[in-house]
Swiss-Prot record:
Subunit annotation: Homodimer.
Name under which the protein is recorded: Orotate phosphoribosyltransferase
An individual GO BP term: 'de novo' UMP biosynthetic process
Family to which this protein belongs: Belongs to the purine/pyrimidine phosphoribosyltransferase family. PyrE subfamily.
Key words of the record: Glycosyltransferase, Magnesium, Pyrimidine biosynthesis, Transferase
Amino acid sequence: MQPYQRDFIRFAIDRGVLRFGEFTLKSGRTSPYFFNAGLFNTGSALAQLGRCYAAAIVDSKIPFDVLFGPAYKGIPLAAATAVALAEQHQLDVPWCFNRKEAKDHGEGGSLVGAPLAGDVLIIDDVITAGTAIREVMQIINAQQAKAAGVLIALNREERGNGELSAIQEVERDFGIPVVSIVSLTQVLEFLADDPQLKQHLPAVEAYRAQYGI
């Protein structure tokens, strides 16, 4: 595990973004942990989150021309990541996002920011069913651009209804890598090393044994 990954897990726990207990997911599964990226909701938290995404991009070595943040949650993530790449890594990359509703006045259209062209790295918080990414792929294709990959905060490494996870389905269907700041494997590693949090390890391991990929 890289230092930025350990820092991210500690940061997510401290912010209440990553919690342990008993949670009913939309899928109906009862999960021993819950991840809510919406709680990275202050200026300093967003700045630190952007630094984590930027570190993951550099670590991934995925070549790309532009960052894309899907509306709505991806917009601040792409912005914060672009800032962190410039300030921490001296990489001044273009970024853009889409509107949910196209405008017919002013700058018009459904895209805002840099042109959506070349190799596009998509930034989002999680991939649950893959529906949002499929919509993004249509936007990218409509601009004759090409998806370079997807970067998310947490990979739950969890099966959907079939044998594959939603992330594996995206990788299979579009032939692009999906990388994450951290995965459940690293969360388990973190729990095992932390005396206060170790109590949650058996429940998370049991959940993984049942639903993991």
